[in-house]
Structures are given as C-alpha cells and as structure tokens.
C-alpha cells in the first residue's frame, strides 16, 4: 500500500523502476540445459551406492513411476549422482540404457551373482512393475556417501532423473568432480 498524491494505492510493480521489473521477470526464466543430468542415488535399504560405484550402475525401482525415469538417459550422457540429504557423490557417463537389474551383467557376470552390500535390490525381480532397473555407468569420480559434496543453495530435488540447469551448482560440480 502506497500514498500516491493523497490516495492510498495497492500496487506491486508499477511504482518500481521499470528496469528492476524487467530484471526480476528475466531472473525467473529457466537457465538453458547444460547437457548434464541430475540423478538420485536412492541409497535407502533397497539399493547401495557402494554397489553402484563398484559395479558401474545407477538403479531405480519400486514402481514404474520411479524406474521409467531412467528411460531419459542415453549412452554417452554425463550424469551427476546425488544422495538425498547428503550431497553429490559421483560423476559418470552412461554406458548402457535401462535394463532390469536381474539382467544386468558386469564383465559377463550377472549382477545378482556378485557379492552385493545390499541384496534387497533383488526385490520383486519377477515383477516388471516393481522390480529394480539399472543403467550402466562408467563412474569417472565418486565419493563415499560420508564424503558427499554440497554447498548452501546447491540444486537438489526428489526426481530420479532431471536436467541440471542451475549455474552455481554446475560450476561447483565441474570443479569438484574435475569435469
């Protein structure tokens, strides 16, 4: 509410400097996509980040709502991996498109035959709706969850996969992961 020539006026922008109004509206536009993907690790008792690091994959499952997000990733795509509430833990390149976890192989050995820290990734493996799915990843640089990297204001959300656009986060990640 403003007093303008003796009248009380309710306004938001019209008394502001018009250049400031333009700058505010431009700041709400999305930044262009960087070409890097944000991915969520989901180390939560179903899947293990240590297994993902060791055997070269990223997993999602528990329903097609979650696993279908992996369809966005193609061979050659660069990804940054994030663990909820902890920070960024990895940078890698997609080497294999989505496949059911029970069919994923590491050097011709089925994933389910390897010593896993979290066997629960095998849950519902005969149910295509609920099973875990993976994409192959050549991890270029990773950190244990206890050493996850973050800063105040770093981009993070609950999506399994999404386009990474935030300039400050990208700068931080490129430096941290030597990209």
Where does each model-flagged region fall?
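Short, flexible loop/turn elements at secondary-structure junctions
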Residues: 43, 83, 96-98, 141
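Short beta-strand-centered aromatic/proline hotspots
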Residues: 88-98
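Contiguous surface segments at macromolecular interaction interfaces
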Residues: 1-39, 43-44, 62-65, 103-179
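Short, basic/aromatic beta-hairpin or loop at an interaction surface
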Residues: 44-60
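Short, well-ordered loop/turn sites that connect or cap secondary structure elements
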Residues: 73-74
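Short, charged beta-turn/beta-strand-edge "cap" motif at the junction between a beta-strand
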Residues: 82-88
């Amino acid at each position: 509410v403003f007093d303008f020539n003796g009248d009380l006026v309710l306004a938001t922008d019209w008394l502001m400097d018009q250049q400031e109004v333009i700058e505010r509206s431009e700041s709400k536009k999305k930044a262009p996509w960087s070409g890097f993907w944000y991915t969520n690790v989901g180390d939560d008792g179903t899947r293990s980040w240590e297994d993902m690091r060791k055997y070269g994959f990223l997993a999602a499952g528990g329903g097609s709502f979650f696993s279908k997000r992996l369809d966005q990733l193609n061979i050659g795509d660069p990804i940054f991996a994030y663990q909820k509430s902890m920070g960024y833990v990895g940078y890698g390149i997609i080497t294999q498109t989505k496949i059911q976890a029970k069919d994923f192989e590491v050097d011709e050995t089925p994933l389910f035959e390897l010593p896993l820290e979290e066997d629960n990734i095998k849950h519902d493996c005969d149910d295509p709706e609920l099973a875990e799915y993976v994409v192959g990843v050549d991890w270029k640089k990773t950190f244990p969850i206890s050493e996850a990297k973050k800063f105040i204001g770093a981009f993070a959300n609950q999506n399994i996969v999404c386009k990474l656009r935030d300039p400050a986060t990208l700068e931080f990640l490129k430096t941290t992961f030597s990209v």
